[in-house]
């Protein structure tokens, strides 16, 4: 039909098709286009798993599938044309362990202006449409009605055949209330009066449509037997938008901490997704925890988010210290609120590895700076 509006011309033709997964047999049509229309270059987008799963067989050797993340904090600042202080370029957060105290002090002073913009990023969300709307109330309304509702009510029925949409919405609302924490499946089933297989199916579908991330516990065998999953929403602004919190999120230390943890996980996941990094959480025998653990081959990297007003010291991260000692991790990270507390902490033990013995240390990184650098290095890695 589009040919009726666009007459054929010489040279390369470019086709851009959105929400392709809603078209029946889209992969067959795309295969024919690639095989027989050599002068066409086609880009298709979709927001659901069928774009990947249904196109794998037909697409081998014909097209590449790329995962596009929502806006990082770095991209958000540039999209809104917000002046950014001159910060050092980092290829990895690991480079912070080579900094001098003077470098930390300088960047702390320069980065202070980013805190308010980071808080607004948490309220608006990481979608371009909501980022560009002037009113935060309108941005959250858009996120709630135009993005979340469409996925729940349109994609779930059209693509996955979900018939009990109301029950699905109740499960999602429950996750908005309890996001960033361990999922108590028994409590969820009891409170919503739903059966466990139904809830498991809903949660898997929510993960398939990229509305949530699900983390399994760190470890193997008996360590994770019957352990609970940890659930993050896909965007820090989803929960305050759905729960109609508005800007009061910033006045609720607990909810704000969850939003920051959600934002940080989104950034670290997007940064290392292409490298097939495994993500989990850790919980020790004395209820000591590590929020996020990244596994890269034989290397484990723990992250703990402590977004609170008071200064965070070694006494506040006993779980992180225990994990580093027992799992032989020489480096860990605390993601904090205190922009002036940007520094390196030394743990009271050394770590022995194949390459020798090294001191165990933790980098205290303010959340706005951590998300800024992760977002920037994600783009830098795509540029090669």
Where are these regions (language model features)?
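Interdomain hinge/linker elements that couple catalytic modules in large macromolecular machines
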Residues: 83-266, 280-284
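Structural recognition of the conserved hydrophobic beta-strand(s) that form the central parallel beta-sheet
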Residues: 16, 41-47, 67
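Short regulatory helix/loop adjacent to the ATP-binding pocket of P-loop NTPases
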Residues: 50-66, 77-82
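A cross-kingdom feature that marks ATP-driven nucleic-acid transaction machinery
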Residues: 204, 211-384
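Conserved P-loop NTPase "ATPase switch" module shared by AAA+ and STAND
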Residues: 9-26
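Catalytic P-loop NTPase motifs of RecA-like helicase/translocase cores
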Residues: 20-24, 51-52, 130
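Short glycine-rich substrate-engagement loop in P-loop NTPases that contacts/grips substrate
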Residues: 1-11
């Amino acid at each position: 039909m589009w040919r009726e509006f666009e007459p054929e011309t010489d040279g390369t033709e470019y086709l851009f098709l959105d929400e392709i997964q809603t078209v029946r047999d889209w992969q067959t049509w795309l295969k024919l286009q690639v095989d027989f229309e050599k002068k066409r270059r086609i880009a298709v987008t979709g927001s659901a798993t069928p774009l990947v799963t249904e196109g794998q067989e037909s697409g081998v050797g014909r097209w590449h599938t790329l995962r596009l993340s929502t806006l990082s904090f770095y991209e958000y600042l540039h999209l809104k044309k917000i002046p950014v202080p001159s910060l050092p370029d980092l290829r990895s957060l690991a480079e912070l362990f080579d900094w001098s105290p003077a470098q930390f002090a300088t960047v702390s002073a320069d980065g202070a202006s980013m805190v308010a913009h980071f808080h607004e990023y948490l309220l608006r969300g990481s979608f371009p449409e909501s980022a560009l709307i002037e009113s935060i109330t309108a941005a959250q309304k858009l996120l709630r009605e135009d993005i979340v509702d469409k996925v729940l009510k349109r994609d779930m029925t059209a693509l996955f055949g979900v018939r009990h949409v109301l029950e699905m919405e109740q499960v999602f609302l429950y996750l908005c209330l309890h996001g960033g924490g361990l999922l108590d499946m028994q409590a969820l089933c009891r409170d919503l009066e739903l059966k466990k297989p139904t809830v498991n199916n809903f949660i898997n579908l929510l993960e398939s449509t990229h509305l949530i991330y699900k983390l399994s516990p760190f470890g193997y065998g008996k360590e994770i037997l019957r352990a609970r999953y940890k659930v993050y929403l896909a965007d820090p602004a989803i929960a305050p938008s759905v729960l109609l919190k508005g800007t009061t999120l910033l006045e609720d230390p607990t909810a704000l901490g969850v939003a920051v943890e959600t934002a940080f996980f989104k950034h670290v996941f997007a940064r290392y997704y292409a490298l097939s990094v495994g993500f989990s959480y850790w919980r020790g025998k004395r209820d000591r925890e590590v929020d996020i653990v990244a596994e890269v081959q034989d290397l484990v990297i723990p992250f703990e988010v402590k977004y609170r007003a008071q200064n965070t010291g070694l006494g506040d991260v006993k779980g992180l210290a225990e994990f580093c000692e027992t799992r032989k991790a020489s480096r860990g990270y605390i993601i904090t609120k205190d922009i002036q507390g940007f520094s390196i902490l030394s743990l009271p033990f050394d770590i022995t590895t194949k390459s020798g013995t090294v001191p165990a240390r933790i980098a205290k990184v303010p959340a706005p700076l951590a998300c800024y650098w992760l977002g920037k290095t994600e783009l830098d890695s795509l540029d090669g």
